[in-house]
Amino acid sequence: MSQQTERLERLLTDELGECCDADVEARLASLRAHRSELPAHPESDLTALSTLGSETRYTIVRLLNATDREMCVCEINPIVDVSNSAISHALSDLFDAGLVTRRKEGNWRYYDVSDRAEALLMALDDTQGDA
Protein backbone atom coordinates (compact mmCIF):
# COMPACT_ATOMS: atom_id res chain seq x y z
CA MET A 1 0.00 0.00 0.00
CA SER A 2 1.20 3.50 -0.74
CA GLN A 3 1.67 6.10 1.97
CA GLN A 4 -1.47 7.92 0.78
CA THR A 5 -3.53 4.75 1.00
CA GLU A 6 -2.12 3.99 4.45
CA ARG A 7 -3.13 7.43 5.66
CA LEU A 8 -6.59 6.99 4.15
CA GLU A 9 -6.88 3.65 5.92
CA ARG A 10 -6.00 5.33 9.24
CA LEU A 11 -8.63 8.01 8.61
CA LEU A 12 -11.28 5.41 7.83
CA THR A 13 -10.33 3.42 10.92
CA ASP A 14 -10.83 6.56 13.01
CA GLU A 15 -14.16 7.28 11.31
CA LEU A 16 -15.53 3.73 11.22
CA GLY A 17 -13.85 2.11 14.19
CA GLU A 18 -12.29 -0.50 11.90
CA CYS A 19 -11.25 -0.61 8.25
CA CYS A 20 -10.63 -3.24 5.60
CA ASP A 21 -9.33 -3.07 2.02
CA ALA A 22 -12.90 -2.91 0.70
CA ASP A 23 -13.54 0.25 2.76
CA VAL A 24 -10.42 1.89 1.32
CA GLU A 25 -11.36 0.90 -2.24
CA ALA A 26 -14.92 2.17 -1.78
CA ARG A 27 -13.68 5.54 -0.51
CA LEU A 28 -11.14 5.79 -3.34
CA ALA A 29 -13.87 5.04 -5.90
CA SER A 30 -16.09 7.69 -4.33
CA LEU A 31 -13.28 10.25 -4.43
CA ARG A 32 -12.36 9.41 -8.04
CA ALA A 33 -15.98 9.93 -9.08
CA HIS A 34 -15.61 13.61 -8.16
CA ARG A 35 -12.84 14.14 -10.72
CA SER A 36 -15.45 14.74 -13.40
CA GLU A 37 -16.72 17.72 -11.40
CA LEU A 38 -13.36 19.47 -11.69
CA PRO A 39 -12.87 21.82 -14.63
CA ALA A 40 -11.03 20.11 -17.48
CA HIS A 41 -9.16 23.34 -18.26
CA PRO A 42 -8.83 25.50 -15.11
CA GLU A 43 -6.47 27.99 -16.76
CA SER A 44 -9.14 30.68 -17.16
CA ASP A 45 -10.13 30.42 -13.50
CA LEU A 46 -6.52 30.46 -12.33
CA THR A 47 -5.72 33.46 -14.52
CA ALA A 48 -8.70 35.42 -13.18
CA LEU A 49 -7.83 34.66 -9.57
CA SER A 50 -4.12 35.39 -9.93
CA THR A 51 -4.87 38.63 -11.80
CA LEU A 52 -6.98 39.84 -8.88
CA GLY A 53 -4.01 39.07 -6.61
CA SER A 54 -2.40 42.43 -7.37
CA GLU A 55 -3.51 45.32 -5.15
CA THR A 56 -3.60 47.72 -8.11
CA ARG A 57 -5.71 45.42 -10.28
CA TYR A 58 -7.96 44.49 -7.36
CA THR A 59 -8.52 48.18 -6.53
CA ILE A 60 -9.34 48.99 -10.15
CA VAL A 61 -11.93 46.21 -10.33
CA ARG A 62 -13.45 47.32 -7.02
CA LEU A 63 -13.57 50.93 -8.24
CA LEU A 64 -15.21 50.02 -11.55
CA ASN A 65 -17.73 47.91 -9.69
CA ALA A 66 -18.48 50.67 -7.16
CA THR A 67 -18.99 53.40 -9.77
CA ASP A 68 -21.25 51.17 -11.85
CA ARG A 69 -20.16 52.91 -15.05
CA GLU A 70 -17.39 52.91 -17.61
CA MET A 71 -14.25 54.80 -16.71
CA CYS A 72 -11.20 56.08 -18.54
CA VAL A 73 -7.62 55.75 -17.23
CA CYS A 74 -7.57 59.48 -16.43
CA GLU A 75 -10.57 58.97 -14.11
CA ILE A 76 -9.04 55.95 -12.39
CA ASN A 77 -5.67 57.61 -11.79
CA PRO A 78 -6.73 60.04 -9.00
CA ILE A 79 -8.10 57.10 -6.99
CA VAL A 80 -5.45 54.47 -7.70
CA ASP A 81 -2.17 56.12 -6.80
CA VAL A 82 0.07 54.68 -9.52
CA SER A 83 1.16 56.02 -12.90
CA ASN A 84 -1.13 56.13 -15.94
CA SER A 85 1.18 53.58 -17.53
CA ALA A 86 0.79 51.20 -14.57
CA ILE A 87 -2.99 51.63 -14.68
CA SER A 88 -3.05 50.95 -18.42
CA HIS A 89 -0.94 47.83 -17.93
CA ALA A 90 -3.18 46.63 -15.09
CA LEU A 91 -6.28 47.23 -17.22
CA SER A 92 -4.73 45.27 -20.07
CA ASP A 93 -4.08 42.35 -17.70
CA LEU A 94 -7.63 42.59 -16.36
CA PHE A 95 -9.04 42.61 -19.89
CA ASP A 96 -6.94 39.58 -20.88
CA ALA A 97 -8.26 37.75 -17.80
CA GLY A 98 -11.87 38.59 -18.71
CA LEU A 99 -12.38 40.79 -15.65
CA VAL A 100 -13.02 44.07 -17.46
CA THR A 101 -14.54 45.08 -20.76
CA ARG A 102 -13.22 47.90 -22.89
CA ARG A 103 -14.34 50.00 -25.77
CA LYS A 104 -12.71 52.78 -27.72
CA GLU A 105 -14.47 56.02 -28.53
CA GLY A 106 -12.38 58.51 -30.46
CA ASN A 107 -9.15 59.05 -28.53
CA TRP A 108 -10.54 57.53 -25.34
CA ARG A 109 -10.70 53.96 -24.15
CA TYR A 110 -13.35 53.14 -21.58
CA TYR A 111 -13.30 50.23 -19.15
CA ASP A 112 -16.04 48.56 -17.16
CA VAL A 113 -16.20 45.61 -14.80
CA SER A 114 -17.23 42.32 -16.45
CA ASP A 115 -20.01 40.03 -15.26
CA ARG A 116 -17.36 37.52 -14.21
CA ALA A 117 -15.57 40.09 -12.05
CA GLU A 118 -18.87 41.16 -10.49
CA ALA A 119 -19.61 37.53 -9.61
CA LEU A 120 -16.16 37.07 -8.07
CA LEU A 121 -16.51 40.26 -6.02
CA MET A 122 -19.96 39.19 -4.87
CA ALA A 123 -18.58 35.81 -3.80
CA LEU A 124 -15.82 37.56 -1.86
CA ASP A 125 -18.27 39.95 -0.22
CA ASP A 126 -20.72 37.18 0.65
CA THR A 127 -18.03 35.11 2.34
CA GLN A 128 -16.04 37.87 4.03
CA GLY A 129 -15.45 36.99 7.64
CA ASP A 130 -16.13 33.28 7.10
CA ALA A 131 -12.45 32.37 7.48
Regions found by a protein language model. Give the residues of each.
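N-terminal leader segment of winged-helix/HTH proteins
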Residues: 1-52
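N-terminal helix-turn-helix DNA-binding core of bacterial DNA-binding proteins
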Residues: 40-82, 110-111
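Short, hydrophobic-biased segments on the C-terminal half of alpha helices
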Residues: 91-92
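Beta-hairpin "wing" of winged helix-turn-helix
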Residues: 96-105, 112
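Conserved segment of winged-helix/HTH DNA-binding domains
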Residues: 113-131
